[in-house]
Amino acid sequence: MKKVCIAIVLLLLMSASAYAENMKIRFGILPVIDTLPLQVGVQDGLFEKHGIDMELIRFASALERDTAMQAGQLDGYFGDLVATYLLINQGVPMRIALTSWRTTPGYPMFGIALSPANKDRDMGDMKGRTLGLSKSSVMEYLADKMEDHLGVNRGHFSLLEIKKIPIRLQMLMTDQVDSALLPEPLLSLARLKGGGTLATAEKLDMPLTVLCLHDKYFADDAEGYAKFIAAYKEAVQRLADSPEKYRSLMAKTCRIPKPLMSEFPVYPYPMPSLPSAAELDEVQTWMVEKGLLKVKVPDETALSPIIP
C-alpha cells in the first residue's frame, strides 16, 4: 500500500510539473507580415520548447479580433497601439508585451498609394484630393504623422472612409479614389498593377504594432511573460539568420500575392523591446484630441512592468 501511495504522489507531481511547463496561450492575429515571428515560433516548436502551448487564432478583421479579446476568448493579441489603448480603456486586462514592428528605413509597412490616373503626381498635386483610409484608427494616426513628416499641413488630403482594405485597394485601382493608405504587401501590389507610391511611413521612427498578453502572464514573477519572450527572441533570431528559409511560410500565412512571392523581402524584425513613454504619450495625445480617449491610460496599467 505504501508503494502504491508513493507511486500516486509521484504521478501527481509529474502531472503538475507537465501542466506548469505547458502554458496555454490562445493568441489572436491578423494575416499580416508583422506576425511572421509568431508563425516561425509555432512552426519550429520554439514556444513548445519554452513550455508554451501556443495556438495562433487567425482573424479576417481587426474588429473580429477585438471582439474576441473583449469576450475573454484570447490570452494574447497582435495589434496597433490605437486599437490596444481602446481595448485597455474598455477594461480588457492586458498589457503591451513588446513592439512587433517599428518603422524601418528601406522596409515600408504602410504607405500612401496612388491610383493609376494619379501615379505621377507629387505631394503638392495631391492637395485636396481623396485619400482612402479607416478613420479614428491607426490609419488616420499614420496619415497625420506622415503629413507632419512630409512638411504639409494636416488636412492636406480629403479623407474618405473606406474601412475594408480589399475594397480600398479595388477603389484605388479603378480610380474611384485618388490615393489610399495601404499596408504592405498591398502597397507593392498597387504599384505592380499600374498605380504609384506617394510616400511611406518607413522614416517616422515610431512603433507601429505590438504584441499584448493577458495580465495573468505578468503574475508570479512574470514567468509566463519570460517564457513568451524567450521563444519570440529565438524566432526573430532564426529569421535574421536564415530569412529565405521562411519565404514559403511568409507567403502562406501573411497573404503575399502570387506576383510578389519570389521577390517581396523578408523583413528584419526587431528583437523584443517596449515602446518608450514618449512614444506612448504621443499616441494617446492624438487619441484624446480625436475624442477616442477621455483621459490617458497610465503606463503602469498598459505596459509590461518588466523590460523584455
How would you name each of these model-derived features?
Residues 219-294:
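Secondary-structure end/capping motifs
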Residues 44, 50, 68, 72, ...:
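Structured segments of extracytoplasmic/periplasmic soluble domains
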Residues 1-4:
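Positively charged n-region of N-terminal signal peptides that target proteins for export
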Residues 7-15:
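Bacterial N-terminal signal peptides
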Residues 82, 156-160, 164-249:
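Pocket-lining segment of extracytoplasmic ligand-binding domains
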Residues 21-150, 159, 178-184, 198, ...:
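Short, glycine-/small- and polar/acidic-enriched structural segments
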Residues 288-308:
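Conserved C-terminal helix/tail region of periplasmic/extracytoplasmic solute-binding proteins
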Residues 16-20:
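Sec/Tat signal peptide C-region and signal peptidase I cleavage site
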